[in-house]
């Protein structure tokens, strides 16, 4: 399987240098990451919003090693929120944040990440939107869920992400499927050991459906993070069986993947949110997109050969 190999490469400094230096790489990356600055991303926000789509914005970046970098990540999100306020687009775009960017892995990282993310959550609430805490590898999740619980005391609309491939996630879903919660379900995009995670696609797909049923039958707000046509159809059927209205759940897909499906679901009246990343530190994000789906890797390889 290529997925684990690609995920290993996402942590390789040598591979980072090789791919980042290739002239064609940036052209291909633009499919998934349409800009590096707030100014470059504003036309994308306007265009998607005009098409009836909502967004979740991710300022890409990982491997924070100093508190100053964590503070810079916080400030980047605050600048984005200020711009959304100016554009009066706060109700169309939420934020997705990785707590690793806010210093979670540093000494005293739990408290540091909470201190850095809280101003972002406060600023988002002030313009009528919210923040979702992304899930990262399994060793970070207890801290993420604790921060999520703490933030929800003052900002109950704060969301979180759960990953279907982890054995623990069904229990997490039961705990989170409560009134007022916002939970995004994804398959998972980190290399996890067999002791904690399913390793085969058919196992992950079955777990995804089991967990999605828990969320749909609960009283929270499920967010379906998938491009899989079969899982999308199953989600619609589970929502129907649970008696959910179209505004009581939403679909989320990545920018640059199945864009026609984004528009189709929105045209049918579904809430459709496009996960849109931007920034200069794109390597780790990009490599996980390749690992998630063989078609992404084929696209990248074909583009490298054609444009190189």
Language-model features: locations:
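Positively charged, amphipathic and often flexible ligand-engagement surfaces
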Residues: 1-308
């Amino acid at each position: 399987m290529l997925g684990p190999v690609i995920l290993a490469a996402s942590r390789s400094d040598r591979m980072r240098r090789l791919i980042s230096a290739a002239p064609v790489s940036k052209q291909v990356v633009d499919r998934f990451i349409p800009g590096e600055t707030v100014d470059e991303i504003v036309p994308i926000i306007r265009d998607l919003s005009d098409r009836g789509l909502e967004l979740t914005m991710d300022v890409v970046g990982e491997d924070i090693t100093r508190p100053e970098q964590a503070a810079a990540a916080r400030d980047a999100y605050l600048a984005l929120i200020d711009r959304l306020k100016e554009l009066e687009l706060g109700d169309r775009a939420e934020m997705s944040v990785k707590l690793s960017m806010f210093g979670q892995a540093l000494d005293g990282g739990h408290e540091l990440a909470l201190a850095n993310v809280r101003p972002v959550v406060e600023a988002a609430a002030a313009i009528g939107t919210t923040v979702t805490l992304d899930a990262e590898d399994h060793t970070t999740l207890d801290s993420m869920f604790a921060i999520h619980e703490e933030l929800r005391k003052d900002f109950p609309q704060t969301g979180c992400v759960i990953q279907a491939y982890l054995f623990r996630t069904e229990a997490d879903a039961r705990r989170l499927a409560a009134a007022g919660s916002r939970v995004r379900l994804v398959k998972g995009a980190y290399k996890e050991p067999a002791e904690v995670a399913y390793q085969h696609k058919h196992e992950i797909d079955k777990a995804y459906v089991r967990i999605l049923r828990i969320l749909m039958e609960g009283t929270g707000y499920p967010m379906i993070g998938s491009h899989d046509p079969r899982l999308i159809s199953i989600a619609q059927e589970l929502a129907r069986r649970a008696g959910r209205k179209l505004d009581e759940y939403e679909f989320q897909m990545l920018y640059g993947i199945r864009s026609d499906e984004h528009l189709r679901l929105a045209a049918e009246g579904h809430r459709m949110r496009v996960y849109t990343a931007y920034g200069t530190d794109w390597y780790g994000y990009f490599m996980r997109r390749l690992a998630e789906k063989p078609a992404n890797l084929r696209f990248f390889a074909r583009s490298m050969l054609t444009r190189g």
